[in-house]
Structure formats: structure tokens, C-alpha cells
């Protein structure tokens, strides 16, 4: 049996946490032969800690062979100690009358503290995924806060755009009648927000070119892409809140499992989307936490290079970049 991997999860008793922990403990994230130690962080509030104990009781009752042990804590220093993987799920949700700037400030405080703790206490090779929204900027804050301690590199911090990627796949499958697993080379650029740009220009399905299946280049095909597909993917979260009365939790948890699994185990040359600190590719300024098409191998991700960016795509990519720059400026004083 392999040595157990330490997985820290924040917001562990929340809706996404509840949907996520059983998947991790079952082996769906790191593999069917990889034991895990769950290091679970919740706010140091009696009610939240009690709820977390209840979740842990359920995890015990599943008798997962791969669940080595669990820790519950309200202290980030304990939760991130020697963590090999960290899923930052807990975030301040947007309340009534809250401006986006207020949301950025409230979350800035949370992710500064957690980033600092990761920088001080986690395994220096920790793989960090920020799920809590606004995910890209929360990841940027955590990254900057951690890097002050000189142990954890920028590249270890990522933001979740996999849910948007999976949503794009699902919409394409519905539109074309092809199985969702047949789609390759789909990308989502930019911010995890309605400004994101799902890009199908290079996509294939069972070897067929998706732009041809969608009749891109004709008035009808281009209208579907611009007026239906892109906004549907971008606003899917809001549509789920409208239908369910709650934000998407199980699908977000599933995307988080996909993101870490692919980063950990590799993608066999397939493209996936990850929010990562830009290396300057595609004229996206270095250090901005931005969604790119990547491939993963040996625990590292690499941006898919050399893709042609047409005028429509450049406009979309710049629009989402502008929003990310505005968010970055809004939190600059906290860093």
C-alpha cells in the first residue's frame, strides 16, 4: 500500500464539501490504490464544528478502505500542516445587497490567512485548487500570500474552471447528439465568471471537427455559438440557483475531483481547462490567474501552445482579462 497523501479541505461541512469528501475518500480523486488523510477545516464556530463532526461520522460509516484517518480543526495551521493537496472550498457567499467589491474584500481576508498558512506549513510541493468564488482572484490572493514565505511556488496554485469546461462539454453533447466523452480539445479562457470564453474552434468529436458539426462560419452556427452556447455556459451557475434555490454543489465537487485527478495522474495528452498563473502565453500578462487549455503529465500542467487566436476570440479573451485586472486592483491593498 502506498503512503497516505494528506488532503486539506476547507469549508468541509458545507454543501460542496459534503459532496466532495466521499468522492475523495473513495479513491475517485487520487486513484484506487492511494490512501488519504483528510485534514478538514471549518470556521471555529460551535455549530460548524459540530456539523463537521457529523460529516466525519458518516465518512467513518462508509468504511472506505482508502481513508487512513481524519482531522477536524478550526485552525488553518493545523489543516494545512504537511498537506500534499489543498482544496480551498470555503468562501464567503455573496449576500443580499453585497457589491462584488465587498465580496472580494470579505474573501480577501479569508484567502490571505489561508495562503499564509499554506506558505508556512504545507508540503512545499502542495497542489492547491481554489473552488470558492471569486475563484481566480481568491487563488491569486492565496498565491501571493503564500509566496511571501518562499517555500511554495506560484505554479502550485490553481483556480477551478473545470466546472465551466464540463458544462461546455455537456452543452456540445446536447447540441450535436454525440456522447460527452467523445469531445476533445475544448478550452475555456479567462475568469470563472460570466465573462469566461468557452472556445470550440479546435474541438473534435469522434474525429469530426466540432466547428463543422456546429456550422460555425455560417450565420446560423455563429449565432448559436455567440448568443446561446457561450452565454449558457457562462450563466449556468445562475440558472442552477434559479432552479434549485441553492448554488451548484455536487457538480462543483465533481469538477474539483476531475481537476485534481488530472493534475495528479495526468491527462494522456488530452486538453483540460485550469485556472493557472499565466506565464505570458497568448499575451495574457504574467502572474494573472487565468483559464487556459492545458495538458498534465507527471504532476505538472503545461499550457497548450501555438493556437491561433482570431479577432472574435481575442476580444472575448481581453474582456475577461479586463475583469480579472479590475478584481486584482480591488484587492491590491490587501497584499
UniProtKB/Swiss-Prot annotation:
InterPro entries referenced in this protein's UniProt entry, alphabetically: L-lactate/malate_DH, Lactate/malate_DH_C, Lactate/malate_DH_N, Lactate_DH/Glyco_Ohase_4_C, Malate_DH_type2, NAD(P)-bd_dom_sf
Enzyme class (EC, first level): oxidoreductase
Annotated substrate binding sites: 94, 100, 133, 167
Signal peptide: none
Keywords (A to Z) from UniProt: NAD, Oxidoreductase, Tricarboxylic acid cycle
Segments passing through the bilayer: none
Active site: 192
Amino-acid positions noted as binding NAD(+) in the UniProt annotation, renumbered to this chain: 11-17, 107, 114, 131-133
One annotated GO molecular function: L-malate dehydrogenase (NAD+) activity
GO biological process terms on file: malate metabolic process; tricarboxylic acid cycle
EC assignment: 1.1.1.37
Catalysed transformations (reactions): (S)-malate + NAD(+) = oxaloacetate + NADH + H(+)
Family named by the database record: Belongs to the LDH/MDH superfamily. MDH type 2 family.
Known function: Catalyzes the reversible oxidation of malate to oxaloacetate.
HAMAP family reported for this sequence: Malate_dehydrog_2
Entry protein name: Malate dehydrogenase
Gene that produces this protein: mdh
Amino acid at each position: 500500500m502506498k503512503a497516505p497523501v494528506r488532503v486539506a479541505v476547507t469549508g468541509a461541512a458545507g454543501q460542496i464539501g459534503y459532496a466532495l469528501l466521499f468522492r475523495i475518500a473513495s479513491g475517485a480523486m487520487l486513484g484506487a490504490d492511494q490512501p488519504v488523510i483528510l485534514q478538514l477545516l471549518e470556521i471555529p464556530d460551535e455549530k460548524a464544528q459540530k456539523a463537521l463532526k457529523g460529516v466525519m461520522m458518516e465518512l467513518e460509516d462508509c468504511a472506505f478502505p482508502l481513508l487512513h484517518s481524519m482531522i477536524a480543526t478550526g485552525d488553518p495551521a493545523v489543516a494545512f500542516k504537511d498537506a500534499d493537496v489543498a482544496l480551498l472550498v470555503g468562501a464567503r457567499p455573496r449576500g443580499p445587497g453585497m457589491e462584488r467589491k465587498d465580496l472580494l474584500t470579505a474573501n480577501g481576508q479569508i484567502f490571505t490567512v489561508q495562503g499564509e498558512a499554506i506558505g508556512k506549513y504545507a508540503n512545499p510541493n502542495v497542489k492547491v485548487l481554489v473552488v470558492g468564488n471569486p475563484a481566480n482572484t481568491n487563488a491569486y490572493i492565496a498565491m501571493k500570500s503564500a509566496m511571501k514565505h518562499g517555500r511554495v511556488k506560484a505554479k502550485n496554485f490553481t483556480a477551478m474552471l473545470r466546472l465551466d469546461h464540463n458544462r461546455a462539454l455537456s452543452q456540445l453533447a446536447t447540441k450535436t447528439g454525440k456522447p460527452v466523452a467523445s469531445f476533445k480539445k475544448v478550452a475555456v479562457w479567462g475568469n470563472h465568471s460570466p465573462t469566461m470564453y468557452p472556445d470550440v474552434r479546435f474541438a473534435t468529436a469522434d474525429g469530426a471537427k466540432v466547428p463543422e458539426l456546429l456550422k460555425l462560419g455560417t450565420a446560423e452556427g455563429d449565432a448559436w455559438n455567440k448568443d446561446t452556447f457561450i452565454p449558457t455556459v457562462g450563466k449556468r451557475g445562475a440558472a442552477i440557483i434559479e432552479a434549485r434555490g441553492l448554488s451548484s454543489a455536487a457538480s462543483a465537487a465533481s469538477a474539483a475531483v476531475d481537476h485534481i485527478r488530472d493534475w495528479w495522474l495526468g491527462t494522456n495528452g488530452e486538453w483540460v481547462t485550469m485556472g493557472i498563473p499565466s506565464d505570458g502565453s497568448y499575451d495574457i500578462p504574467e502572474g494573472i490567474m487565468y483559464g487556459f487549455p492545458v495538458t498534465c503529465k507527471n504532476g505538472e500542467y503545461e499550457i497548450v501552445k501555438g493556437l491561433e487566436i482570431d479577432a472574435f476570440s481575442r476580444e472575448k479573451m481581453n474582456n475577461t482579462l479586463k475583469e480579472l485586472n479590475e478584481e486584482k486592483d480591488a484587492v491590491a491593498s490587501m497584499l
